[in-house]
Design a protein with these regions (language model features):
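Glycine/proline-enriched, intrinsically flexible loops and inter-domain linkers
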Residues: 1-237
Length: 237
């Protein structure tokens, strides 16, 4: 079958279809077990890598970057966490730059605007930006959630889909979710992973939670008013 192929079929990235099976189960159980399910999240193995040919060696970098988890009936989704079956740790930026001098990490943090709104909001995805410091480098990836956004449940809004970009001069190039993409000195490689879907209608969110999100930079005052129906000035006044 598609999910259990027989030899000698070539296979790769098995974690991604495993995550989609999990999503299907959650969606199927939602109508009968609403208290036990989660909205969709990034739910994928965002395997990103770069290769670089120096004068005396070939350097290979690979890392799995997390994203936002979906919300549930009692809690917001977790921020910037790997998929349940990825089991990968976060590599410190300083270690990356020491080990791979052909690149520099210019930004690394939560991706603003990626979380799906809801009574309980989804988790935030990741935004990471690499500056490429030399030619002879390439970007390689297999990922998912670039076309179909993580869905929300029971009125919750979807999270933002993932996207990989290369900023080259005044041009912005979109990199597919599975790709081998040549890089040039001066390129900015932008990795933005998906946020989680929300659970429940946004207008049912506790205003105190909306104000907390505003203070933490998860939402703007305009989003608090337009999406959640919370007038920040009135609550502060």
């Amino acid at each position: 079958s598609f999910l259990n192929p027989s030899r000698p079929v070539a296979v790769r990235a098995r974690n991604n279809p495993c995550n989609r099976i999990y999503n299907v189960v959650m969606l199927a159980l939602a109508p009968v077990m609403p208290e036990q399910v989660m909205a969709a999240g990034d739910d994928t193995t965002n395997a990103i890598g770069m290769g670089y040919q120096s004068e005396d060696a070939y350097h290979v970098y690979m890392e799995v970057v997390g994203g936002g988890w979906g919300a549930c009936a009692s809690a917001d989704g977790a921020d910037v966490v790997d998929a349940p079956i990825a089991n990968c740790s976060n590599i410190p930026v300083e270690a990356l730059e020491v080990e791979y001098p052909f690149m520099q990490v210019e930004e690394y943090g939560m991706r603003r605007g990626s979380a799906g709104a809801g009574q309980y909001r989804g988790g935030m995805g990741v935004r990471r930006v690499y500056r490429i410091l030399d030619d002879n480098a390439s970007f390689n990836c297999y990922s998912d959630r670039h076309r179909i956004a993580p869905w929300g449940l029971f009125g919750g809004q979807p999270g933002a889909p993932s996207r990989f970009l290369v900023e080259r001069g005044g041009e912005v190039l979109t990199v597919p979710s599975k790709a081998n993409f040549p890089l040039k000195k001066g390129d900015r490689l932008v990795i933005e992973t998906a946020g989680g879907g929300g659970f429940g209608h946004p207008r049912e969110r506790n205003p105190a939670a909306v104000l907390r999100d505003l203070a933490d930079g998860y939402v703007t005052a305009e989003e608090a008013r337009e999406v959640y129906g919370v007038d920040v000035a009135a609550h502060r006044g």
